[in-house]
Amino acid sequence: MKDWLDQIKWDADGLVPAIAQDHKTGRVLMMAWMNREALSLTAAENRAIYWSRSRGKLWRKGEESGHVQKLHEMRLDCDADVIILMVEQIGDIACHTGRHSCFYRVYEDGEWKTVEPVLKDPHAIYSAGH
């Protein structure tokens, strides 16, 4: 049997996009990147672990903010090039801006409008020493 990680179509940088979705509501929370190690650890630890392209290292979601994503289910799309993580978002905040979702802007009347409130000031989140 082929290794489950080998069935994924990784991009040229060895990454695959991962969409985090609320396991109860189905709402999209965020999108991030995963490499083989991040995906393997996500499955092993039952929590979302991503690859930070800007920092060049593994990023355990919630390691600084406390806003961990507990894994309930992983799905692979029909082309095997996108992962969906069905998660429980601890603390109800997925976005580094302090909002529930990173998708808090809607296109309306020719512009992007903010439609979701900040639930917690990002400075308070990231200076709390989690």
UniProtKB/Swiss-Prot annotation:
GO terms for biological process: L-histidine biosynthetic process. Mg(2+) binds at residues 77, 79, 81. It is an enzyme of class 3 (hydrolase). Its EC number is 3.5.4.19. It is found in: Cytoplasm. GO terms for molecular function: magnesium ion binding; phosphoribosyl-AMP cyclohydrolase activity; zinc ion binding. Its main location: cytoplasm. Its cofactor is Mg(2+); Zn(2+). Keywords: Amino-acid biosynthesis, Cytoplasm, Histidine biosynthesis, Hydrolase, Magnesium, Metal-binding, Zinc. InterPro entries: PRA-CH, PRib_AMP_CycHydrolase_dom, PRib_AMP_CycHydrolase_sf. Pathway: Amino-acid biosynthesis; L-histidine biosynthesis; L-histidine from 5-phospho-alpha-D-ribose 1-diphosphate: step 3/9. Binds 1 Mg(2+) ion per subunit. Binds 1 zinc ion per subunit. It catalyses: 1-(5-phospho-beta-D-ribosyl)-5'-AMP + H2O = 1-(5-phospho-beta-D-ribosyl)-5-[(5-phospho-beta-D-ribosylamino)methylideneamino]imidazole-4-carboxamide. Homodimer. Belongs to the PRA-CH family. Catalyzes the hydrolysis of the adenine ring of phosphoribosyl-AMP. This is Phosphoribosyl-AMP cyclohydrolase 1. It comes from Pseudomonas fluorescens (strain ATCC BAA-477 / NRRL B-23932 / Pf-5).
